[in-house]
């Protein structure tokens, strides 16, 4: 966390006991020192004092918070400084926070202080020249109010919470301290920094215990003498906040304020009480961190208690060598002092596990409006009994630091950083194995005279084959030797010594050739373990293979990680379902909360189904996990292979994982695929129909109507009376809707729309002739909604110009026909196409236009086809539907008309 230092000076500012002596070692910043008329203004002196003190106490070896995310590493800590000073009737304040550069002798802050000091001295001289009346005209209350506003402006420039620690040093004059009514606004500004920014306030001065008692109590400030001014700022502090313990059973929270974490110098790490089954030498991390980007860490305001833990149950790979010191920023809080004593008394075998939330952001988050000075003033105006901090959401990656708190033996408390389950991965295990291999290499060479693992490994059959080949080679070598002795006319008899040397030499060359041709075999797993056990009988040497490090699978690091990760997920799920996040296990018992909707499989149960090689113990079968009160019992001796070859009748009575999705007797997958493809073709704006004000015409129906048979057999014909009743009901409902529409919406000119056409018939006013409107010029007409649509204004697709009322005279009828010939609407075009389809269908069944029953059959087939087509969900492929409907109903219509005609 970055550090922000604010120096506030009220009064004369003469501090000879501390700042003046320090100023002797620094540059001269006041031209009036040593004189009685000019004040010893020591803002620059105090700045030099603090700068030198902080620079001397900074140790680069002190522990800091490491990166807790793979997204990047935190940037280096920065220090900022600002000053607000009041002397007499003059005050000045820094306009912004200035960064402190410890590597330079003089920085920008010193120039600003020098300039303001000169202005202050000039203002004091002017005041001394003026008479007392003009000085009395100035009000100290206005001066302090102006100073308070400047402090509010500085507070508005602080970063988001969790990013900065604010330290305020208040220097008060020994003589004539200001009255409470005068400096009250400025104290309010400091209270703002104290409550909402967790600022640490220190009041320095002689006799401040008496003069500033009320201010110290109100601001919860520490009071120190001027001699201790150099020790006010602790550069080792890394975090300030409170310790928070939740009791989940009763929903009770206990908070202990005024805690801090300090960095300490790295010491030797003791693991005598840890589970050291796979403890290795600490691996030094890489110093090259430039490859990772810089990120910003925003730490939580509270250390949250998780649980008490026994160190022997904690795997050593979770322990880090990063330690901090837990301390108090203010020793006046008795509850916090008692808690610190209790934690410090924990022995080396037990510790308390806490978690510190942290949010990681790639960018610097701007100051939040919830903590602004304007919000503070509005909040204080309401006169709250207790001051609470507004909730501020810091967006970014959520992470956390786990800290194990224990006593360090000196009545102090140490906090050891614990790796979380998310930070333990394969890289850690790999580094652990390599570290053990490297540390034991030298010992292995010294403790064992030769390396058995480097020798070639053969099976029994390979040795027999090699010896047979060696015998053959030796026979050939002996024959070649005798042959050469014979050619050289030497005696063929060979002495024993010569024969022995020949066989030995032959064997040597053969084995060299054999080893060169056949490479050294890699040890198999079982042979490795056996060899490892043999080696352990002689010396505790670890072999060169990572698979030999742990012979007992129960002690593998991966298993500990898996179990801990599973426990971590369960704990996180409980935190999510509970009302209190990041809480510990219950202090007074377990609370029966709602059951989790997600069933988690315990790590031990999961590992039972796998061997030490990671292979399944048997054929893969779904695990019978009970997610409710009823247990899903699987059919015994059933596997995916057997299920695939079962017929549908047998598979429907089986119980198996996922079987409810694959009971397919009608090629459901193909049907669903086709239906999805059909739905994907629908166009949104073509699926609207019109809500017309005209009534629905009733076709003359005197006989049973055959049902539309596109996807069913043409034999199912409903009763004619039922169909007529349905049509009458539809007509009466449409008439009522037409009247309602006439009342709700005034008549106005309707504009032709490019949306879908309706297959409903339109009347032409007083005329008894029906203009049948059928949709689509292409198989691209759109879906028409049912006529029972709600009364909402939808653009009409009909052409009302052709449906306007006309007189019964020949002139108006002639004009109407002429207009239809000039411009044909879509519905008229569809009507014409349907009539043409009906005519062509009747011709196929020998009913031509010259036939006496052509008119009746044509009218009857047209009405039936239109009655079906009006209920289509989409007009895509309308022409094909017309032909299909006409062909399916043509035979019934012709038979019915011919039968009716013959009876006459």
Curated annotation (Swiss-Prot):
GO terms for cellular component: chromatin; kinetochore. Residues 812-830 have a biased composition (Basic and acidic residues). One of its GO terms (biological process) is protein localization to kinetochore. Residues 19-38, 754-784, 800-830 are annotated as: Disordered. Coiled coil: none annotated. Keywords: Cell cycle, Growth arrest, Phosphoprotein, Ubl conjugation pathway. It holds the Pfam family MTBP_C. The modification Phosphoserine is found at residues 597, 639, 703, 707. Residues 521-904 are annotated as: Interaction with MDM2. Belongs to the MTBP family. Interacts with MDM2. Inhibits cell migration in vitro and suppresses the invasive behavior of tumor cells. May play a role in MDM2-dependent p53/TP53 homeostasis in unstressed cells. Inhibits autoubiquitination of MDM2, thereby enhancing MDM2 stability. This promotes MDM2-mediated ubiquitination of p53/TP53 and its subsequent degradation. This is Mdm2-binding protein. It comes from Homo sapiens. The gene is MTBP.
